[in-house]
Amino acid sequence: MIDPDGYRPNVGIVLIRRDGQVFWGRRVRRDGWQFPQGGMHSDETPVEAMYRELNEETGLLPEHVQLVGATPGWLRYRLPSQAVRCNRSQMCIGQKQVWFLLQLIGDESHVQLDQSENPEFDHWRWVSFWYPIEHVVMFKRSVYARALCQLASLAQQVVGLEVGTMPQYVQDICLLNVGYKHLPNWVSRY
């Protein structure tokens, strides 16, 4: 399913513990790490897609998490030119995502990465809230910064304290629509 602008509807998941650490998964047979995410089926709402992807990629069920909130709208990112795909007559140039913040309320032993026929992750760990922005594949960094910026106040409610200091470049990215003078080099490339 690709929208008329060439973006594939998708959901992203930030799974947070009470101590402010977030789930970080290593992609199978790759060295890349990322949050759980996945495409929506044409008959799904974003919430339905989120719970399906959560189970497929982490093994967690709705009773293991609490839905804290979501980004207010779609966040888009473009794929690098070598990753642009054609699906029948449609070209997919990127993804548009609704990002969800979930609090883990079950035991982390419920995390099982082998719940689907084609697991997404082969390893996982907990990392600090802002860590993923600098460690995800380059073309997703801006969307990760925007998602975490929009979810940070909700995350602070879960944690009950600061989720760490928002790096200056993240603040810059969060205000990207206004126009900037001093963005990190990688932002201008995507």
From Swiss-Prot:
Keywords per UniProt: Hydrolase
Coiled-coil spans in chain: none
Motif residue range(s): Nudix box: 38-59
InterPro entries found in the cross-reference section: NUDIX_hydrolase-like_dom_sf (IPR015797), NUDIX_hydrolase_CS (IPR020084), NUDIX_hydrolase_dom (IPR000086), RppH (IPR022927)
NCBIfam families: PRK00714.1-4, PRK00714.1-5
Protein family membership: Belongs to the Nudix hydrolase family. RppH subfamily.
Protein name per the record: RNA pyrophosphohydrolase
